[in-house]
Amino acid sequence: RCNVTHNCTDISKLCEAYPRGGKKLRSLFSQFNTTDTIDWFENRNILLKTEKDGRMFPISDKSQTIIDCLVSETIRLKIDLQLGKSIEQMNQQGEGWKLQFKNLPTQHFDSIIVATGGSSKIKGFEWLKDLGHNIAAPIPSLFTFNMPNESIKNLMGLVVEKAKVRILNSKIQTEGPILITHWGMSGPAILKLSAWGARDLAVKNWQ
């Protein structure tokens, strides 16, 4: 459905909602925050709705609504959207950047944004390391719990609207809805716990 943003306009509280990197986001949210996001979409005739937990979605409940809006903006602004190109190398050149593509001519740009994606996209992190950036080891986050040997799976399909979940031998806990699945546990509370406890769980080898 595309969870566009969260209905929180207090920048301090918004930063606190990020398990990692919240302090670094403060200056960015001071320039463009939740209210700006809502206004941006409304100015393009995309209305958002707020659910009980504060998450905001397009009233259509379809992610395609957001995709269509963003694509329309690229067309309106005459942005050259290039797909299916593989970047082999990037280097800083003067005040700009030189990108070397696979089987294509080298191109020059004033600035670049590197969206590395998940931890499987190692090449993006290697580029950043080569440019002198320090990279914190990427680890899984926002995942469900696979519990193959637990009897709780017998309750598959059960939804508990108000549950409190905690990582064993840790102070990290969250509250909210959970869903019992055929593989273990899922739902907003579980996903949030996996985000806040990502590094603790990695140290425990997700056991």
Q: What function would you assign to each model-found segment?
A:
Residues 1-80:
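Conserved N-terminal/central alpha/beta ligand/cofactor-binding core
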Residues 7-11, 134-137, 147-207:
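An anion/pyrophosphate-binding glycine-rich loop and adjacent beta-alpha core
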Residues 77-82, 104-108:
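Glycine-rich phosphate-binding loop signature in dinucleotide/nucleotide-binding domains
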Residues 81-85, 137-139:
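Short loop/edge segments at beta-strand edges and connector loops
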Residues 83-97:
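A conserved short coil-to-beta-strand element within the FAD-binding core of flavoproteins
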Residues 87-88, 99, 107-120, 127-129, ...:
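Short hydrophobic core segments
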Residues 93-95, 101-108, 167-172, 203-205:
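Short, basic, low-complexity termini and linkers enriched in Ser/Thr/Gly/Pro
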Residues 111-153:
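Glycine-rich loop(s) and the adjacent beta-strand/alpha-helix scaffold that form part
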